[in-house]
């Protein structure tokens, strides 16, 4: 994490109000707004959208907020939250401009909220975090502000800091369902599944008729390697709402992780058949193509990804097109051919002018990362150095934590390719949520004699259960290796829930 972020985020976690006697009952602050009809229909419509947004029902939230924006065009927060939730790049830019134009005329709270969330969207992280801290200090008992801060920190993979804020949100309102959901994920991402399941039980009890709690429970069970129970909860979500697409995708991804690839492809087809947009359908087709990687049929996977890239291009989904070509570059063993796929990915990104900055920059960073690694593997040190230089400039310009980890992982993997193992270790240790970096770190640990660390990391990597291409390329092969190693077989069985 960039040093400036550390200090700013720690400010967010400091006490922001005087301690109160335990016997005094306090009420959470009501969220003030600048809308003229804040006590009437407009307020109710905004709150309905906010509740839907917090519980991952983005389309319902957007429907409420778009209606409100037409009714109350001078309500700044509705424009801000539309820009934050929409997947339409043009709408995102337009609504963000509307919110910023109204910012000078609104309350302190609304102004700080606009500074924070617009700063995040525009990758101006230092002023954004400063505004977030001011909000938390000025409105310490506003559960929505505390929750949104925790949610955003979680999205930046700052799980321990996020957990503290989300715990505070649940203390302000023990019935705050969305906070329990996000808190459960924070626990799960740090490996604390016991507390994750406890928080998830609270979440599902609070919203028994909502599909999202069952979907979240399923995902966390899957992260823990409990695939069968995960499938059961995904199916419960679909029983509540047969149109809840994330659970249909979750079923497909779970079968893929289980190694039941043909079944997974059938489930991806179901998801694609119910897709609301062509770009969404292409995304499912990309995931389906990855099942052939797990079956060790790379040519079939490459052919399907090439088709998906063409479809994405026709649908003007440049980011998906770039992702498909980058996936092809990852799968391709020949370095020269891999670099050609990366050229196509870069060309697609050049056409993605309407894509929000954070998403575009992260995809560009991943392309540069892989380019540097493949050039180093091909013995082209100067080319690798140039790619790393471009990646470093990108992460220094934006100060994003995800970009910083991508740079660290790229630097470490290039050093491993150059057999500079001791130098690689500290870089790779900054990117230990990426299976490719974890694999290279195991190699580096082994080469420098840190075999105990290598063994521990092998077990952690074997328990990685995210449905990504990186996982498909690394984890199944590692599990096979561990299963053949007598002294590690027992650990693997425990990790896979076989005992």
Q: Where are the predicted features?
A:
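Residue-level recognition of tetratricopeptide repeat
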Residues: 50, 84, 117, 151, ...
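Acidic, proline/glycine-rich low-complexity intrinsically disordered segments
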Residues: 17-166, 172-178, 185, 190, ...
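Helix-start (N-cap) detector for alpha-helical repeat units in TPR-like alpha-solenoids
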Residues: 42, 76-77, 107-109, 143-144, ...
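Position-specific recognition of the canonical hydrophobic site in helix A of tetratricopeptide repeat
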Residues: 53-54, 87, 120, 154, ...
């Amino acid at each position: 994490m960039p040093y400036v972020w550390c200090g700013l985020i720690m400010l967010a976690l400091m006490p922001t109000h005087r301690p109160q006697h335990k016997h005094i009952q306090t009420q959470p602050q009501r969220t003030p707004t600048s809308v003229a009809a804040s006590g009437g229909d407009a307020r109710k419509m905004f709150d309905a959208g906010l509740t839907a947004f917090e519980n991952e029902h983005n389309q319902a939230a957007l429907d409420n907020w778009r209606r409100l924006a037409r009714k109350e065009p001078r309500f700044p927060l509705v424009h801000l939250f539309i820009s934050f939730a929409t997947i339409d790049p043009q709408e995102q830019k337009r609504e963000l401009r509307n919110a910023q134009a109204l910012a000078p005329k609104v309350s302190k709270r609304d102004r700080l909220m606009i500074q924070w969330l617009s700063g995040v969207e525009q990758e101006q992280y230092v002023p954004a975090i400063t505004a977030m801290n001011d909000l938390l200090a000025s409105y310490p008992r506003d559960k929505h502000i505390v929750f949104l801060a925790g949610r955003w920190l979680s999205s930046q993979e700052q799980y321990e800091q996020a957990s503290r804020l989300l715990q505070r949100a649940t203390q302000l309102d023990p019935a705050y369902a969305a906070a329990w959901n996000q808190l459960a994920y924070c626990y799960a991402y740090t490996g604390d599944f016991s507390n994750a399941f406890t928080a998830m039980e609270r979440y599902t009890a609070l919203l028994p008729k909502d599909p999202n709690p069952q979907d979240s429970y399923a995902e966390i069970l899957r992260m823990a390697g409990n695939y069968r129970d995960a499938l059961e909860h995904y199916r419960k979500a679909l029983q509540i709402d047969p149109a809840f697409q994330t659970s249909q995708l979750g079923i497909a991804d779970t079968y893929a992780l289980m190694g039941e690839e043909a079944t997974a492809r059938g489930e991806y087809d179901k998801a694609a058949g119910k897709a609301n947009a062509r770009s969404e359908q292409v995304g499912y087709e990309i995931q389906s193509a990855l099942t052939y990687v797990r079956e060790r049929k790379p040519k079939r996977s490459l052919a399907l990804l090439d088709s998906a890239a063409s479809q994405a291009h026709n649908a003007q989904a440049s980011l998906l097109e770039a992702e498909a070509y980058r996936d092809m570059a990852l799968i391709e063993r020949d370095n020269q051919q891999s670099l050609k796929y990366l050229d196509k990915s870069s060309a697609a990104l050049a056409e993605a002018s309407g894509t929000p900055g954070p998403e575009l920059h992260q995809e560009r960073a991943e392309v540069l990362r892989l380019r540097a690694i493949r050039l180093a593997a091909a013995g082209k040190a100067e080319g690798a150095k140039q790619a790393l230089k471009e990646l470093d400039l990108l992460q220094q310009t934006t100060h994003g934590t995800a970009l910083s980890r991508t740079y660290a992982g790229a630097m470490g993997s290039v050093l491993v390719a150059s057999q500079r193992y001791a130098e690689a270790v500290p870089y790779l240790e900054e990117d230990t949520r990426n299976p490719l970096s974890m694999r290279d770190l195991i190699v580096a640990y082994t080469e420098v004699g840190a075999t105990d660390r290598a063994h521990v990391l092998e077990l952690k990597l074997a328990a990685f259960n995210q449905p990504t291409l990186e996982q498909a390329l690394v984890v199944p092969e590692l599990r096979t290796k561990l299963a053949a190693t007598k002294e590690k077989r027992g650990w693997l069985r425990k990790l896979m829930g076989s005992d």
